[in-house]
Amino acid sequence: MEYFDMRKMSVNLWRNAAGETREICTFPPAKRDFYWRASIVSIAANGEFSLFPGMERIVTLLEGGEMFLESTDRFNHTLVMLPISRTCVFQ
């Protein structure tokens, strides 16, 4: 089994300065045009998610109280931290 240490993962700051991403893995590896990616993000402020056309996202709240996801034309959803966290899937 392989373990990931967040303290050793490289950090990519978001262009809007509202958060940062720590990439765990992608397929194919080290490609910008990936088929899938697993990452951990830290969100510091309200802001827009970057667009990845055609890519489905699955969001699971790992810590914190709650997070509100809003889209003007698609959905509104509040993620709440639970003992067994729920996920939100969106494009």
Swiss-Prot record:
Any coiled-coil regions, as ranges: none
Lineage: superkingdom: Bacteria
UniProt xrefs under InterPro entries: RmlC-like_jellyroll, RmlC_Cupin_sf, Uncharacterised_HutD/Ves
Pfam families associated with the record: HutD
Disulfide bonds: none
Gene3D superfamilies for this protein: Jelly Rolls
Similarity remark: Belongs to the Ves family.
UniProt name for this protein: Putative protein Ves
